[in-house]
Design a protein with these regions (language model features):
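Extracytoplasmic/periplasmic substrate-binding proteins
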Residues: 251-318, 365
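Gram-negative bacterial Sec-dependent N-terminal signal peptides
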Residues: 1-20
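Extracytoplasmic ligand-binding site segments that recognize negatively charged/polar headgroups
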Residues: 50-63, 79-86, 101-262
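Short, well-structured alpha-helical segments in soluble
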Residues: 91-100
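Short, hydrophobic alpha-helical packing/hinge segments within bilobed ligand-binding/sensory domains
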Residues: 87, 115, 264-265, 325, ...
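Short, polar/charged alpha-helical segment
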Residues: 33-41, 45-75, 167
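Conserved C-terminal helix/tail region of periplasmic/extracytoplasmic solute-binding proteins
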Residues: 21-33, 266, 372-407
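Mature extracytoplasmic/periplasmic domains
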Residues: 306, 311-380
Length: 407
């Protein structure tokens, strides 16, 4: 339940473990679930995850950490990071140094490019998901679950939540927000200084740029599949032209960009800009609840669609506490934990499991959840959901923005 710094964890990464075989993935997958739980009891799990939301942090450290300690005697160390690549780089450095079973990272909240990097570098533990009792709640036949930004999951990570990009505005001051990318472009020019977006490599800023990229390409369907340089070049030239043309109309005339989604939210809260956005619409509700945003904030998707994805948890190849990480993953998938996560007061995140496969009492609780007025429903968003691109595309777009727009 406590949160440790990265430096502190690295300092103890090579400390011998009380149960050394909890690092042996092959041995664990040969055990029964009860045997895995016995191996995990009294242990520790170091979970590296984005730490920018107090509500998410409380859900993880308080609710999840409390259950782990009460039911299994497992200590959950939530390690807050600003970008998932920080955790990936720790594992990469350990792999290069030959640290094969005493790594500092036991689990990562992850998807997209970072998962691809771990798969390509043989840095993620695979082949264990069938050992999780709650794996039966996952619909692995759903391509949006079985593939992470076009990369097959292949038993190398476990879904945690679903999310879809949404825009937010204050209905008291902006009664009719722009509802499509071309409308947004026109609105920005008609309202100079009232819009901006975080610079790459910020995750949410990158997603906004991809929406413009989809528009420039004539639709997401023209970009699906493996990276295609010719298709990229055609869409990229149009995208950079659009964004550079918009720059003088942005906040501070585009001379500077927010460095993070947190910074953009602060500009919105201070009424310096009229809109913000997030890949997790529940964040708008949490901001209203904690007083950061006014109660008149509302959110929505675009008529031409917004990008959606699934996020996951993954266990590095050299985690010394794999048994405890498995118990944590199984708990995160459970009906009660997914219900609590979906509660607006806790987080409001959409479940990654099939609700119909949960126990009747959990299904009943899901049915009673009412989303906050500031949070657009996943049902409404889902009517115009756009797929994510494969990771090679995302890397190219991010680097292209830095070279052609950001510099």
């Amino acid at each position: 339940m406590k949160s440790l710094t990265i430096a502190a964890l690295l300092a103890v990464a090579l400390t011998p473990m009380a149960k050394a075989d909890t690092a042996d993935g092959a041995a664990l997958t040969a055990m029964t679930w009860d045997q895995i739980v016995d191996q995990a009891r009294g242990g520790t799990v170091n979970w590296f995850m984005w730490g920018g939301s107090d509500s998410i942090n409380q859900y993880v450290s308080g609710y999840i950490g409390g259950i782990l300690m009460a039911d299994y005697g497992i200590t959950l160390n939530r390690v807050g990071i600003t970008d998932t690549v920080e955790a990936v780089n720790i594992v990469l450095g350990e792999k290069q140094a030959g640290v094969s079973d005493s790594g500092a990272v036991d689990m990562i909240w992850i998807n997209g490019e970072n998962f691809r990097t771990m798969r390509q570098g043989d840095m993620v533990w695979c082949g264990y998901t069938d050992a999780l009792p709650n794996n039966t709640l996952i619909n692995w036949n759903n391509p949006a679950i079985a593939n992470d930004f076009g990369v097959p999951v292949a038993g190398c990570e476990v879904p945690w939540s679903k999310s879809q990009f949404a825009f937010a505005y204050d209905s008291a001051t902006l009664p009719n927000p722009p509802k499509s990318i071309p409308d947004l472009i026109a609105w920005i020019k008609a309202n100079p200084g009232q819009f901006t977006y975080p610079a790459a490599p910020d995750f949410n800023g990158g997603v906004f740029v991809r929406h413009v990229f989809y528009y420039a390409a004539g639709g997401a369907e023209n970009l699906l599949g493996p990276f295609d340089q010719a298709k990229y070049d055609a869409a990229a030239s149009k995208t950079w032209a659009i964004l550079n043309d918009l720059e003088p109309y942005l906040w501070r005339k585009g001379d500077t960009y927010p460095t993070s989604i947190t910074a953009l939210d602060q500009l919105f809260a201070n009424k310096e800009v009229s809109m913000t956005f997030n890949y997790d619409a529940s964040q708008f509700g949490l901001a209203v609840q904690n007083g950061s945003f006014p109660e008149t904030v509302r959110s929505y998707g675009l008529t031409d669609g917004t990008i959606s994805n699934t996020n996951y948890t993954a266990i590095p190849f050299n985690s010394p506490n794999k048994a405890a990480a498995l118990v944590l993953q199984n708990l995160l998938l459970s009906g009660p934990a997914q219900v609590e996560k979906a509660m607006p007061a806790a987080w409001g995140a959409a479940p990654a499991i099939e609700i119909a496969r949960t126990k009747p009492e959990d299904q009943a609780k899901f049915a009673t959840i009412t989303q906050l007025p500031s949070v657009v429903s996943m049902e409404d968003l889902g009517k115009s959901a756009l797929p994510e691109l494969q990771a090679d595309w995302i890397s190219a777009i991010e680097q292209g923005w830095i070279r052609n727009v950001g510099q």
